[in-house]
Amino acid sequence: MTFRIETAARGRFAVFILSGRIEAPAIAELRRLFELQSDYRDIVLDLKDVGVVDRDVMHFFARCEADGVKLDNCAPYIREWMEREKD
């Protein structure tokens, strides 16, 4: 299964709507898109349609959130995994 990234604007936020199975190779594309933004605090990752993520992506999401990126519609299993890895 592949992943997909759609972009949208929500007020002052650049929204990246992710779907599918997100694996480590997707991180480079997400970083590239982030670099096109002037401020990470203005980025939202909408994870509503994300099915599965691998460990690298989970760590990437955690770092993004720590840097001020908003994670919308984050699946409970991803959120719990991020919390467990923090400990």
Specify the residue positions occupied by each region the protein language model found:
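Amphipathic alpha-helical interaction surfaces in cytosolic regulatory modules
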Residues: L18-D87
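Short beta-strand/loop segment at the start of cytosolic alpha/beta domains
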Residues: M1-V15
